[in-house]
Amino acid sequence: VPVPLYHCFGMVMANLGCLSHGACAIYPSEGFEPEAVLDAVEREKATALYGVPTMFIAELALPNFGRYDLSSLRTGIMAGAPCPIETMTQVNELMNMTEVEIAYGMTETSPVSFQTRVDSPLNKRVSTVGKVHPHVEVKIINPDTSEICSVGEMGELCTRGYSVMLGYWENPEAT
């Protein structure tokens, strides 16, 4: 778990994901250090790795990247920014993460609303954020009119479902 625990990616997706599935969470260092991440993957035979695209880019760019045995990796989640196809190809081929998924959401949606699947084609994993999670509804509206936007029109994403928080603690104005 090289992603920060103060963010929903580390705290909810990583910790809660491991806890709910009986998996082990590995914390390679206090802050993100690419060498520490790959050392931990190799030493602990990790099967999954989380990160934002720039974290994977930093790991792949290590001068000694080729010395790490990453054969135990198979999956993970990449989120926080779009992933260039070149990076996703390298993550698939050089890091053995052929089942890495892309996720999109907000802290307020606990934290993911959209996600690709492990079998999503490469081009879908780099050009979309996947499909809406079950039991979650989304729409894109014009913030000035509250009307639903046409396909291709920019607007505000609205999410509804069991995963959406009820409000900000003792802050009704922000809610």
Language-model-detected regions and their locations in the chain:
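Gly/Ser/Thr-rich phosphate-binding loop
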Residues: 20-23, 38, 43-51, 60-124, ...
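Short beta->alpha connector loops at strand-helix junctions that form conserved
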Residues: 28-30
